[in-house]
């Protein structure tokens, strides 16, 4: 071990001092790979944390949460629950809940740009009966000081006595801040977004009457009831919908699982491309020290000592690069968290996190990734350096390294691509709560990317078949006819990066093309109306029947229709149940059918079973098909058709409006669509409604279309950043590969210069060699990327989200991508060639 440490101190660290810029560049390369993964991970975790926190209440986690099968619970149900439980020591906490939006927050005109808070009404008497559960400042000792209004967290920034103007459903109301609940260690504190109010007052403000949304149950341990929690749940499940206390938080993670998993996979694919770059950089380090390694071996240093010394140096580089990657990853996460949060807010539920925090475990994970990647990348160069005889490493005519047999066997790449084709045919892994994991699809994508990179050498030799009379061309092509491992890795990195970018571009184009067609089919009304507080997918705002009637009496309105919505728990996952006017939808042909109903008037039934339409996401998530009969909230439902819906991956079931009202005992609307009379200006009507109804958001058809496409583009904003990083890394890798190759050939370059070849011609030869590698990588990458796009569109997307997309490629985008990679690769190669043309025949440390 002393020999290894001596080599590190006298050789490795000396090179670090003499060539500090090169070592810093290596650290940056390592940092880039780990920081991309860490940034995406921190951003998605921060958004998820905000999403989960939005479900938190004011007590410890309840043992059970009880809701009605359909509709709302009533105060009389509390007596039934208490009678069912008998003398068991279980506390009941009735709750009403509504999302609210501050009226002062005007946003920027975009859906989701305004804040979303929660107004929580709880029974203060029941809350105070829970020892240690009441937030500080609401203890029994000062119950008489409890005033009318809302209690808020200090994080909200409001003061006692201050008035808050809030949007609730379609109304703008004013509530007074009754007090600010201080934060005390060991006592539950209010989340920043939560407004707490006494239950009777909240019922009055929200116009709920005697209705409540849910009841939280907290069991108290007792020797008389050793299995109290399980017994309580069993008794309640006989009459009501019962969830475990942790289900709300777990459901938040489940809903966003596919979205977050896709981000993670993309960041890991970018890390794969970075792995090629790390290999080439460390291979260059070994190459620069070949003479030194040869001298050490001649002095009797063992192969094992040399290999261990290089691996330890690589680990040290990985540690330094990883530490830098943690910093870059944290900074990148701050930039990415906004985009990820907006996407989750629009598609899943309210989350307002704008900062990503870094934990010790996440930092250690990033360091581990960097060190592991460095060791893996350094293992092969270190092994070859240790095993190469000294005679092959010393002097001006050291033998060029062409790579081991495994790197020259191209059939391995083709075999991996064949395996990817077979894996793409396997079904998705399904779990009991309806979530899916396309493990075979992700594995197929990985094998296809790596296999395409390894098989790209075939294209490299095809490019080299070009006959040339010029000496510059002949020299450039001669190196490509017998490519070394550095050529192969350079073209593999380019092919993988271009394939990843092409595949994502095809998926985005397919989504865009499909979305536009779906929007044209389903958005035919002139004006769409929702509550101004509906800023996220979890918003519970509704429009009252009175307001709907006023909209129908608006001058210029010819037809009005509305959609009702409720969220239910079905087979362990949340689903959306919709109620629509089927006659209006049939008249205007609003459905984009995946499987059309057998009879046009699908809402009519000959028996007691309710007809319904499911979305494609529902079918993919739960395995329900047209013709199946399911049990939903105590009702028999027959699936008569399936429609395409691209804004909801949880799945939706559509009922006739009469059935919906009977099930849920409500006439409130979720969204309202207005058809205007011919010649009426939609913008004029929109402005008039907004002036008369400040609690509503009103969108013209054109505006809502733009918003839908904006949310779609926002969803893929992080994806585009990862694509750009991958291509940049691959092009830099090409430059590093050529640098190593030309360093290895510096004696040959000196000979060519002595024979009369000018330095400019040497630089041109290097540029043409880089052009050949770039062409092979670009052509292979685009071809492989088209199949990868097919995999993403028809397999991974379908299995993750349940959406069928129409395959669509923007060919001129792909042509621009290929041209950009080729031109950039040639320019990088030319710069390296100009530098190499000035190299002396003997290497000196720089």
Predicted regions and their residues:
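Alpha-helical transmembrane segments, especially those used as permease/efflux helices
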Residues: 1-6, 10-26, 234, 258-261, ...
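Membrane transport/envelope proteins' first extracytoplasmic loop
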Residues: 2-272, 284-287, 303, 343, ...
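Alpha-helical transmembrane segments
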Residues: 18, 22-24, 34-62, 283, ...
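Hydrophobic alpha-helical transmembrane segments of multi-pass inner-membrane transport and secretion
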Residues: 20-45, 257-291, 315-329, 369-376, ...
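Juxtamembrane segments of multi-pass membrane proteins
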Residues: 65-72, 458-598, 616, 707, ...
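Short beta-strand boundary microenvironments
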Residues: 113-157, 537, 545-626
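Small-residue-rich transmembrane alpha-helices
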Residues: 279-282, 315-348, 361-387, 414-430, ...
């Amino acid at each position: 071990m002393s020999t290894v440490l001596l080599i590190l101190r006298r050789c490795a660290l000396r090179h670090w001092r003499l060539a500090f810029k090169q070592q810093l560049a290596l650290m940056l390369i390592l940092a880039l790979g780990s920081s991309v993964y860490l940034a995406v991970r921190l951003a998605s975790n921060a958004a998820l944390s905000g999403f989960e926190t939005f479900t938190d209440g004011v007590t410890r986690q309840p043992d059970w949460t009880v809701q009605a099968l359909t509709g709302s619970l009533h105060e009389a149900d509390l007596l039934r629950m208490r009678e069912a439980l008998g003398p068991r020591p279980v506390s009941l906490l009735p709750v009403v809940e509504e999302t609210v939006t501050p009226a002062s927050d005007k946003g920027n005109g975009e859906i989701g740009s305004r804040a979303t808070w929660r107004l929580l009404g709880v029974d203060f008497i029941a809350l105070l009966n829970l020892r240690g559960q009441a937030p500080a400042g609401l203890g029994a000792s000062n119950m008489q000081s409890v005033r009318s209004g809302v209690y808020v967290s200090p994080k909200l920034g409001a003061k006692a006595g201050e008035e808050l103007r809030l949007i609730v459903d379609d109304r703008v109301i004013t509530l007074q801040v009754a007090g600010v609940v201080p934060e005390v260690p060991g006592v539950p504190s209010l989340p920043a977004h939560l407004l707490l109010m006494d239950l009777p007052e909240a019922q009055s403000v929200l116009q709920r009457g005697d209705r409540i949304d849910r009841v939280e149950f907290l069991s108290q341990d007792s020797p008389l009831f050793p299995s109290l929690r399980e017994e309580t749940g069993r008794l309640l499940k006989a009459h009501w919908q019962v969830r475990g206390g942790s289900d709300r938080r777990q459901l938040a993670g489940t809903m966003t699982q596919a979205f977050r998993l896709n981000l993670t996979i993309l960041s890991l694919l970018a890390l794969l491309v970075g792995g090629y770059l790390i290999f080439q950089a460390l291979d260059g380090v070994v190459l620069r020290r070949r003479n030194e390694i040869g001298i050490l071996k001649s002095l009797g240093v063992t192969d094992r000592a040399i290999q261990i010394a290089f691996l330890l140096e690589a680990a040290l580089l990985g540690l330094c690069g990883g530490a830098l990657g943690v910093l870059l990853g944290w900074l990148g996460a701050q930039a990415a968290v906004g985009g990820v949060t907006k996407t989750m807010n629009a598609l899943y539920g309210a989350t307002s996190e704008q900062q990503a925090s870094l934990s010790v475990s996440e930092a250690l994970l990033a360091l581990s990734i960097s060190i592991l990647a460095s060791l893996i990348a350094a293992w092969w160069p270190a092994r070859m350096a240790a095993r190469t005889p000294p005679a092959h490493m010393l002097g001006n005519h050291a033998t060029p390294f062409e790579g081991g047999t495994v790197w020259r066997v191209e059939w391995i790449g083709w075999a991996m691509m064949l395996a990817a084709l077979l894996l793409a045919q396997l079904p998705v892994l399904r779990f009991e709560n309806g979530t899916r994991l396309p493990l075979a699809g992700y594995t197929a994508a990985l094998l296809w990317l790596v296999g395409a990179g390894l098989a790209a050498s075939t294209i490299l030799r095809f490019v080299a078949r070009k006959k040339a009379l010029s000496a510059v061309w002949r020299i450039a092509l001669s190196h490509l006819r017998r490519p070394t491992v550095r050529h192969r890795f350079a073209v593999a990195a380019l092919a993988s990066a271009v394939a990843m970018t092409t595949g994502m571009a095809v998926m985005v184009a397919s989504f865009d093309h499909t979305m536009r067609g779906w929007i044209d089919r389903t958005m035919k009304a002139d004006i769409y109306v929702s509550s101004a507080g509906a800023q996220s997918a979890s918003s519970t705002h509704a429009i009252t029947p009175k307001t709907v009637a006023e909209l129908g009496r608006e001058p210029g309105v010819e037809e009005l229709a509305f959609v009702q919505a409720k969220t239910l728990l079905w087979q362990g996952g949340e689903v959306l149940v919709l109620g629509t006017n089927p006659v209006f939808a049939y008249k205007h042909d609003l459905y984009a059918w995946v499987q059309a109903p057998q009879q046009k008037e699908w809402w009519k039934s000959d028996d007691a079973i309710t007809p319904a339409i499911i979305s494609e996401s529902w079918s993919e998530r739960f395995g329900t098909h047209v013709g199946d009969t399911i049990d939903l909230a105590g009702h028999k439902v027959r699936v008569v058709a399936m429609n395409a819906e691209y804004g909801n991956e949880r799945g939706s079931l559509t009922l006739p409006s009469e059935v919906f009202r009977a099930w849920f005992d409500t006439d409130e609307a979720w969204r309202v669509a207005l058809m205007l009379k011919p010649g009426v200006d939609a913008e004029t009507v929109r402005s008039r409604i907004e002036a008369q109804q400040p609690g509503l958001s009103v969108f013209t058809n054109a505006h809502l279309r733009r918003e839908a496409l904006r949310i779609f583009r926002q969803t893929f904003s992080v994806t585009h950043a990862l694509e750009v990083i991958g291509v940049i890394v691959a092009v830099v890798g090409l430059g590093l590969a050529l640098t190593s190759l030309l360093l290895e050939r510096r004696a040959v370059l000196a000979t060519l210069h002595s024979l009369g070849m000018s330095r400019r011609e040497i630089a041109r030869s290097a540029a043409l060699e880089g052009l050949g590698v770039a062409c092979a990588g670009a052509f292979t990458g685009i071809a492989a990327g088209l199949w990868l796009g097919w995999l993403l569109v028809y397999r991974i997307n379908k299995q993750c989200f349940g959406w069928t997309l129409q395959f669509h490629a923007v060919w001129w985008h792909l042509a621009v991508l290929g041209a950009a990679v080729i031109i950039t690769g040639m320019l990088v190669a030319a710069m390296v060639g100009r530098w190499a043309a000035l190299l002396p025949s003997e290497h000196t440390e720089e």
